[in-house]
Amino acid sequence: MNLLTGRNMVERSSKFLFIVVGSVLFMLILYQYVAPGMMNFGSPHGYMLEDDADLFPTPDPHYVKKFYFPIRDLERTVDFEIKGDDVIVFLHIQKTGGTTFGRHLVQNVRLEVPCDCRPGQKKCTCYRPNRKETWLFSRFSTGWSCGLHADWTELTNCVPGVLNKKESRMKNQRKFYYITLLRDPVSRYLSEWRHVQRGATWKTSLHMCDGRTPTPEELPPCYEGTDWSGCTLQQFMDCPYNLANNRQVRMLADLSLVGCYNMSFIPEKKRAQVLLESAKKNLRDMAFFGLTEFQRKTQYLFERTFRLKFIRPFMQYNSTRAAGVDLDNDTIQRIEELNDLDMQLYDYARDLFQQRYMYKRQLERREQRLKNQPLFPFRRTSSSDSTFRDDAPESEGSRLPTEDYMNHIINRW
């Protein structure tokens, strides 16, 4: 009798244990089935991959690639050591939205030790967590230490020496990660014209190259007097020395290759070709670049490149001074001709940017699927993977003139 009673108790315990285990497994599978995207088992570097689904647009499955880029040009994840000697260097091209992005770098990055930005001061202190040395070289951290809107030629020759002087010691082990923003050339050109029309000059820019600044003969002014305020668009376009023409190519290229600002160094056609190819190479080799017209994708690529997370999402604002300019087709064509090198560079950069975004998103999703597959083989694909699309402001097919959005962002913050 006792033997039968013991056997019954064992059978009941086994059944109870089976029911409990089965219920737990069923609930886990059901949870994954009805609520995919709700569970996160700790993505690397603090990324909430599933939560990002609503923030970052899906790559266009119908996007047609224009250029071939090997994997080494698409993969842009760097081992940025903020506690080491690594430095991010921001090359700020005029009227590309760089003011907004620069503010993001000093005010909107989630850091162990945030940048110290005090009211009334133009610069923030961005120290490493473990010592009083800067990890960021930019307008809002170190100021215009290499000159106002210093270009690639100036920065690469100036930054190491400036940091050695600031930190009072020589360092040969620093890694410099150059970053920049590009913008649709016509929109950028119009924005610069409106800025100059209001009195901006940038005449304190050094334009240092091969150890010297350009002579007045090499770089004649477009106007007489203190500024060019009130100039018409026609006057702006008519000046052959206007640095607004092809500004993005000039600021990204190695000017030493073409004799700096000496136009007689090599023939004009050869000079243009060398500048364009140099700008493409330097852009391709940079740790990161973004496009003003694609704020969310720019945020995504920066975060994945440096494994740094922004606190608040980037906003896409398209109501700018450039947007309010009504132009006829002839004027637009003339601006495109004056900025032919920039048009070619932007076409190249936009394709590289989109391919990098697609590559990184696909890689991330593959990693997520592999991570979830062993645990939940019956998991249904998240509907968010196929339903969310590019947000309207990041339209692929139209020109979206965007520039400095800080007033909007400050109000929202």
Curated annotation (Swiss-Prot):
Cytoplasmic side: 9-15
UniProtKB keywords: Glycoprotein, Membrane, Signal-anchor, Transferase, Transmembrane, Transmembrane helix
Binding site for substrate: K122, K123, R139, W144, H149, H195, W202
Record: residues binding 3'-phosphoadenylyl sulfate: 92-100, 183, 191, 315-317, 321-322
GO molecular function: heparan sulfate 6-sulfotransferase activity
Bilayer topology annotation: Single-pass type II membrane protein
InterPro entries according to UniProt: Heparan_SO4-6-sulfoTrfase (IPR010635), P-loop_NTPase (IPR027417), Sulfotransferase (IPR005331)
Function: 6-O-sulfation enzyme which catalyzes the transfer of sulfate from 3'-phosphoadenosine 5'-phosphosulfate (PAPS) to position 6 of the N-sulfoglucosamine residue (GlcNS) of heparan sulfate.
Transmembrane segments: 16-36
Name the record gives this protein: Heparan-sulfate 6-O-sulfotransferase 1-A
Subcellular location: Membrane
A Pfam family this chain is assigned to: Sulfotransfer_2
Main location per the UniProt record: membrane
Residue ranges, annotated region (Disordered): 374-401
Residue ranges, Lumenal side: 37-413
Tissue: During somitogenesis, first expressed in polster and presumptive forebrain. During mid-somitogenesis, expressed in eye, hindbrain and anterior spinal cord. During late somitogenesis, strong expression in eye and hindbrain, decreased levels in midbrain and anterior spinal cord. At 24 hours post-fertilization (hpf), expressed in neural retina and lens, brain and anterior spinal cord. At 36 hpf, retinal expression is confined to the ciliary marginal zone and there is strong expression in tectum, rhombomeres and otic vesicle.
Active-site residues (renumbered): H149 (proton acceptor)
Organism: Danio rerio (Zebrafish)
